[in-house]
Amino acid sequence: MQGAAAWLHANTEAGTMIFQLDWDDFPYLFFHNTQNAYLVGLDPTYLQLASPDLWNLWVSITQGRVEQPSGFILNTYGAPYVVGDRQHDAFADQAANDPNMQIVYLDQYSIIWRVNTSD
């Protein structure tokens, strides 16, 4: 996650919301990049209690149960980037079939997609 955090720091503006695929990636991301805002950090229960609908949608997206996830990620969560480790095959399959999801960073541990606006 260190490489992904460094890429985000170098290529995004301060305060940019980042949609991460696992809440437990937050400590690594935040340690290496404090300039961005992260959707879920420290404990996912905070989002679950504060906004059950957003929580349930986040879970569905991260588990690859939402087709064309870009619209929800950008319009519902305000996140122009998605970051995750390389173990989210179901989400990666959905992202690969979404014309508005573009891989902008990839290493052996992590992947970042840019969420493009619809044409």
Where are each of the predicted segments found?
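Extracytoplasmic
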Residues: 1-119
